[in-house]
Amino acid sequence: MEMKQINETTLKIMITMEDLEEHGMELKDFLIPQEKTEEFFYTVMDELDLPDNFKNSGMLSFRVTPRKDRVDVFVTKSDLKEALDFNDLSDMEDYSGLSPEEFLKALEDNFMDKGDIEAHHKLEEHDKTLKEVDETMTEPAKEVAEETIREDYTHYVLAFSDFDQVVTFAQGLKNVSVEGSEFYKLGDVYYMTILLYLADEPDYYANNMYARFLEYANVADRTRPYLQEHATILMEEDALPVLQATKWS
């Protein structure tokens, strides 16, 4: 387990799947607060060397977010002098064994308030890089740097008429690996952004992959910036790998 202090009121605890197994925990144990979950959090808090301002700090709330290889627990303290509150496990879903409808409802219910969770999207990193280019480089140098970034990566926005189509998309692309992916809902339509890394691939790779995507998805009528501003984000990162790994009942 690793711990990182985000700010004065929030800690991020990174728990590997091996850590969970050692403590007799499974992902599904976090779906509904229970005594086992409470005992696990007490154990984690005891094992870690908490910052002084988190010791005896009163009420603590927890948000649990699954990743591909670990579970991230965000611990937020309040000034209320109450016992630990284990009822705020709002960001955790049991990704296996749910029907598509149950999975979707869990996402819509639990991914509305992302609070202080750090975003590590590759696309956002590239946006930041381009801004730094604008601030520090001469005009010819900027053109070269921007062109290099664009050549190394490409991204697509795909649309889905319903969640069943999303499931079919993920199942049909079981062996496809992408650099990044996000999952949105706008009205009755679902959207997924896909980031591909092209540097080590042949020239035809991007077109071939896009054609494969469109075997299961539709061409989107919205851009990523538009979705970021107007849509509900259901999964901030690794959307496709999570959906690929999910066993649908």
Swiss-Prot record:
Superkingdom of source: Bacteria
Molecular functions per Gene Ontology: protein-macromolecule adaptor activity
Pfam families for the chain: MecA
An annotated GO BP: negative regulation of DNA-templated transcription
Free-text note on domains in this protein's UniProt record: The N-terminal domain probably binds unfolded/aggregated proteins; the C-terminal domain interacts with ClpC.
Family, similarity comment: Belongs to the MecA family.
Subunit structure: Homodimer.
Function comment: Enables the recognition and targeting of unfolded and aggregated proteins to the ClpC protease or to other proteins involved in proteolysis.
Protein name, as recorded: Adapter protein MecA
Organism of derivation: Streptococcus thermophilus (strain ATCC BAA-250 / LMG 18311)
Organism ancestry: Bacteria, Bacillati, Bacillota, Bacilli, Lactobacillales
Gene designation per UniProt: mecA
